[in-house]
Amino acid sequence: MPELDRDTALDWIERWDRQQEESLPDREDRFTALIDAVEEGTGRPDPLVLDLGCGPGSLAVRLLDRLPRAPVSGSDADPVSLALGRAAYSGRPGLRLVDLDMREPGWSARLNLARPADAAVSTTALHWLPEHDLRAMYAELATVLGPGGLLLDGDHFTLDVKESPTLARLDLALRQREDQRRFPAGHSESWSAWWEAAAADPLLSGHVAERARRRVDAGHHGTESTQLATHVEALIQAGFAEVGTLWQRGDNRLLCAVLPAEYPSR
């Protein structure tokens, strides 16, 4: 497999970010709010942060730009994203990118954490997990976060169409209308078009083939776990004491969950 160089990787990541920003016009604002919450919520300059479903490292490097002393362990099961991140950010102090699948029990052991993590973060990734895998992942995550540890997840979280059919319909309609106003001629590059282009690049085609072999997105239809209520219920079941929305634009939300703090010794 030809070696992926840093400049090519950065070009592909820039193209990825551009494609994502068209689908998520408030992506940078959400990144900023998430990092604000990490900084404020952990209360230390060097929080140990887990980036779940890190992709090529878009969030991780923004975290390190703000908090250069924070060790960030990114994890993903996608070999293409990991190859891009490793080629682009090799040698970046504080950053580790780990190849693992959060659907597999015991996934957290592969992170080899030196201490309990202060925060776990994710953006536009955890909705890929089927509900039973999401619940198991949250339960395992709670075992590797320290007391008072945070989960911060930025994503499109939908309302329950059975419980709130009108609100759910309006929520979706507003997002679709905004998208049509911003891009009347359609997006310059769709998610699927980006992947088709990546598969045609000799420097990435081998990683794309490995992605297909692993069946990373087999059966994925984009709505496995998008309902807000599913995440809230799963997090409470996993032992998180507080769950709520910190930032929101339409159905684009930053969900925050907090583990109980240790009781003071008596």
Predicted regions and their residues:
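Class I SAM-dependent methyltransferase SAM/SAH-binding core
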Residues: L50, S58-W107
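Conserved glycine-rich SAM-binding loop
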Residues: G55
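A conserved beta-strand element that flanks and buttresses the S-adenosyl-L-methionine
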Residues: V121
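Short alpha-helix
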Residues: T223-A238
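A short glycine-rich, Lys/Arg-flanked "PGG" loop and its adjoining helix->strand segment in the class I
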Residues: R135-P147
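Core SAM-dependent methyltransferase catalytic element
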Residues: A241-R266
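Conserved class I S-adenosyl-L-methionine
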Residues: M1-P45, S58-R62, G106, L152-R181, G186-S190
